Protein backbone atom coordinates (compact mmCIF):
# COMPACT_ATOMS: atom_id res chain seq x y z
CA UNK A 1 0.00 0.00 0.00
CA UNK A 2 0.89 3.64 0.32
CA UNK A 3 2.91 4.46 3.43
CA UNK A 4 1.21 7.82 3.91
CA UNK A 5 -2.21 6.17 4.09
CA UNK A 6 -1.16 3.26 6.30
CA UNK A 7 -2.51 2.90 9.82
CA UNK A 8 -0.15 2.76 12.76
CA UNK A 9 -2.36 0.07 14.34
CA UNK A 10 -4.91 -1.53 11.98
CA UNK A 11 -3.83 -4.61 10.00
CA UNK A 12 -5.05 -5.51 6.51
CA UNK A 13 -2.61 -8.18 5.29
CA UNK A 14 -4.84 -9.55 2.51
CA UNK A 15 -5.70 -6.10 1.18
CA UNK A 16 -2.00 -5.22 1.21
CA UNK A 17 -1.17 -8.42 -0.69
CA UNK A 18 -3.90 -7.69 -3.25
CA UNK A 19 -2.59 -4.14 -3.68
CA UNK A 20 0.97 -5.38 -4.17
CA UNK A 21 -0.13 -7.75 -6.97
CA UNK A 22 -2.73 -5.60 -8.66
CA UNK A 23 -3.36 -2.16 -10.06
CA UNK A 24 -2.93 0.81 -7.77
CA UNK A 25 -5.22 3.79 -8.23
CA UNK A 26 -3.07 6.49 -6.66
CA UNK A 27 -5.01 9.50 -7.96
CA UNK A 28 -8.59 8.46 -7.25
CA UNK A 29 -11.24 10.54 -5.52
CA UNK A 30 -14.51 9.80 -3.79
CA UNK A 31 -17.40 11.94 -4.97
CA UNK A 32 -18.14 12.97 -1.37
CA UNK A 33 -16.65 12.45 2.09
CA UNK A 34 -19.75 10.55 3.26
CA UNK A 35 -21.60 7.45 2.09
CA UNK A 36 -24.96 8.43 0.55
CA UNK A 37 -23.77 11.08 -1.95
CA UNK A 38 -20.88 8.83 -3.01
CA UNK A 39 -23.20 5.84 -3.43
CA UNK A 40 -25.61 7.83 -5.63
CA UNK A 41 -22.73 9.25 -7.64
CA UNK A 42 -21.39 5.77 -8.37
CA UNK A 43 -24.80 4.41 -9.40
CA UNK A 44 -25.80 7.29 -11.67
CA UNK A 45 -22.48 8.78 -12.77
CA UNK A 46 -23.42 12.26 -11.54
CA UNK A 47 -21.74 14.51 -9.00
CA UNK A 48 -23.40 15.08 -5.61
CA UNK A 49 -23.95 18.72 -6.59
CA UNK A 50 -25.78 17.74 -9.78
CA UNK A 51 -27.77 15.18 -7.78
CA UNK A 52 -28.59 17.85 -5.16
CA UNK A 53 -27.62 15.27 -2.55
CA UNK A 54 -24.58 16.36 -0.57
CA UNK A 55 -25.13 14.97 2.95
CA UNK A 56 -26.29 11.81 4.69
CA UNK A 57 -30.00 11.85 5.50
CA UNK A 58 -31.10 14.25 2.76
CA UNK A 59 -34.42 13.66 1.02
CA UNK A 60 -33.83 11.93 -2.32
CA UNK A 61 -37.44 12.00 -3.57
CA UNK A 62 -36.48 14.51 -6.29
CA UNK A 63 -34.26 11.88 -7.94
CA UNK A 64 -36.05 9.86 -10.65
CA UNK A 65 -34.52 6.52 -9.67
CA UNK A 66 -36.54 4.46 -12.16
CA UNK A 67 -35.88 6.74 -15.14
CA UNK A 68 -32.16 7.40 -14.77
CA UNK A 69 -29.50 5.07 -16.12
CA UNK A 70 -27.68 3.11 -13.42
CA UNK A 71 -24.62 0.89 -13.77
CA UNK A 72 -26.80 -2.24 -13.99
CA UNK A 73 -29.13 -0.71 -16.59
CA UNK A 74 -26.26 0.45 -18.80
CA UNK A 75 -24.58 -2.97 -18.72
CA UNK A 76 -27.85 -4.72 -19.57
CA UNK A 77 -28.43 -2.30 -22.45
CA UNK A 78 -25.04 -3.31 -23.88
CA UNK A 79 -25.58 -7.06 -23.40
CA UNK A 80 -28.92 -8.49 -22.26
CA UNK A 81 -27.09 -11.53 -20.84
CA UNK A 82 -25.53 -9.32 -18.16
CA UNK A 83 -26.59 -10.24 -14.64
CA UNK A 84 -26.11 -7.66 -11.91
CA UNK A 85 -25.95 -8.31 -8.19
CA UNK A 86 -25.79 -6.20 -5.07
CA UNK A 87 -25.13 -7.52 -1.58
CA UNK A 88 -24.94 -5.55 1.64
CA UNK A 89 -25.84 -1.96 2.42
CA UNK A 90 -27.94 -0.25 -0.24
CA UNK A 91 -29.09 2.96 1.44
CA UNK A 92 -30.79 4.58 -1.54
CA UNK A 93 -34.32 5.87 -2.11
CA UNK A 94 -35.34 3.00 -4.40
CA UNK A 95 -34.65 -0.72 -4.31
CA UNK A 96 -31.86 -2.37 -6.29
CA UNK A 97 -34.52 -3.93 -8.58
CA UNK A 98 -35.66 -0.43 -9.63
CA UNK A 99 -32.07 0.34 -10.64
CA UNK A 100 -31.83 -2.85 -12.71
CA UNK A 101 -30.17 -5.29 -10.31
CA UNK A 102 -31.24 -8.91 -10.77
CA UNK A 103 -30.03 -10.34 -7.46
CA UNK A 104 -29.52 -8.75 -4.07
CA UNK A 105 -30.56 -8.02 -0.54
CA UNK A 106 -33.17 -5.38 -1.27
CA UNK A 107 -33.33 -1.86 0.12
CA UNK A 108 -31.04 -2.39 3.11
CA UNK A 109 -29.59 0.30 5.36
CA UNK A 110 -27.01 0.53 8.15
CA UNK A 111 -29.52 -0.85 10.65
CA UNK A 112 -29.53 -4.14 8.69
CA UNK A 113 -25.84 -4.45 9.51
CA UNK A 114 -26.28 -3.88 13.22
CA UNK A 115 -26.25 -0.07 13.53
CA UNK A 116 -27.88 1.70 16.47
CA UNK A 117 -27.56 5.49 16.63
CA UNK A 118 -26.66 5.97 20.30
CA UNK A 119 -23.56 5.87 22.51
CA UNK A 120 -23.54 2.07 22.49
CA UNK A 121 -22.35 2.13 18.87
CA UNK A 122 -18.78 2.73 20.08
CA UNK A 123 -18.72 -0.22 22.47
CA UNK A 124 -17.15 -3.42 21.16
CA UNK A 125 -19.35 -6.49 20.74
CA UNK A 126 -17.71 -9.88 20.15
CA UNK A 127 -19.62 -12.04 17.66
CA UNK A 128 -19.11 -14.89 15.18
CA UNK A 129 -20.09 -12.88 12.08
CA UNK A 130 -19.32 -9.22 12.73
CA UNK A 131 -21.34 -6.86 10.54
CA UNK A 132 -22.32 -9.93 8.44
CA UNK A 133 -18.83 -9.91 6.88
CA UNK A 134 -18.70 -13.65 6.31
CA UNK A 135 -22.34 -14.04 5.25
CA UNK A 136 -22.03 -11.27 2.64
CA UNK A 137 -18.74 -12.65 1.35
CA UNK A 138 -20.21 -16.17 1.05
CA UNK A 139 -23.26 -14.90 -0.87
CA UNK A 140 -21.10 -12.76 -3.15
CA UNK A 141 -18.83 -15.75 -3.82
CA UNK A 142 -21.86 -17.94 -4.61
CA UNK A 143 -23.06 -15.26 -7.06
CA UNK A 144 -19.65 -15.22 -8.76
CA UNK A 145 -19.59 -19.03 -8.95
CA UNK A 146 -23.09 -19.05 -10.46
CA UNK A 147 -22.13 -16.50 -13.11
CA UNK A 148 -18.94 -18.40 -13.92
CA UNK A 149 -20.73 -21.75 -14.26
CA UNK A 150 -23.41 -20.24 -16.51
CA UNK A 151 -20.75 -18.24 -18.40
CA UNK A 152 -22.79 -15.07 -18.10
CA UNK A 153 -21.17 -11.64 -17.95
CA UNK A 154 -21.80 -10.01 -14.59
CA UNK A 155 -21.45 -6.95 -12.43
CA UNK A 156 -21.27 -7.38 -8.67
CA UNK A 157 -21.35 -4.65 -6.06
CA UNK A 158 -20.65 -5.68 -2.47
CA UNK A 159 -21.18 -2.96 0.13
CA UNK A 160 -20.03 -4.38 3.43
CA UNK A 161 -21.54 -3.01 6.63
CA UNK A 162 -18.03 -3.04 8.10
CA UNK A 163 -16.16 -0.89 8.84
CA UNK A 164 -18.90 1.20 10.42
CA UNK A 165 -20.27 1.49 13.90
CA UNK A 166 -21.63 -0.40 15.82
CA UNK A 167 -18.27 -1.96 16.56
CA UNK A 168 -18.37 -5.74 16.11
CA UNK A 169 -15.45 -8.16 15.84
CA UNK A 170 -14.64 -11.83 16.31
CA UNK A 171 -12.97 -13.11 19.48
CA UNK A 172 -9.84 -14.06 17.54
CA UNK A 173 -9.42 -10.69 15.78
CA UNK A 174 -10.04 -8.81 19.03
CA UNK A 175 -7.42 -10.95 20.80
CA UNK A 176 -4.95 -10.46 17.94
CA UNK A 177 -5.31 -6.68 17.96
CA UNK A 178 -5.42 -6.48 21.76
CA UNK A 179 -1.97 -8.12 21.88
CA UNK A 180 -0.42 -5.36 19.73
CA UNK A 181 0.82 -1.97 20.93
CA UNK A 182 -1.73 0.78 20.29
CA UNK A 183 -0.92 3.33 17.61
CA UNK A 184 -0.74 7.09 17.98
CA UNK A 185 -3.42 7.74 15.34
CA UNK A 186 -5.47 4.57 15.72
CA UNK A 187 -6.13 2.97 19.10
CA UNK A 188 -9.61 1.40 19.16
CA UNK A 189 -9.00 -2.35 19.56
CA UNK A 190 -12.55 -3.32 18.57
CA UNK A 191 -12.51 -1.18 15.43
CA UNK A 192 -9.12 -2.62 14.50
CA UNK A 193 -10.52 -6.13 15.04
CA UNK A 194 -13.49 -5.34 12.79
CA UNK A 195 -11.10 -4.05 10.12
CA UNK A 196 -9.08 -7.27 10.35
CA UNK A 197 -12.28 -9.34 10.07
CA UNK A 198 -13.27 -7.47 6.90
CA UNK A 199 -9.80 -8.00 5.46
Where do the protein language model's features map onto the residues?
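Formylglycine-dependent sulfatase
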Residues: 1-199
Amino acid sequence: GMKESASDFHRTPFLEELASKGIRFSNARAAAPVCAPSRYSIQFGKSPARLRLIRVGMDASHIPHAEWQSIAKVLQSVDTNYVSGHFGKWGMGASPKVLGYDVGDGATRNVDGGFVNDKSQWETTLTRDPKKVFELTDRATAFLDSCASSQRPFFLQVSHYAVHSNIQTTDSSFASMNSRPLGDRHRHVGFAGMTLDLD
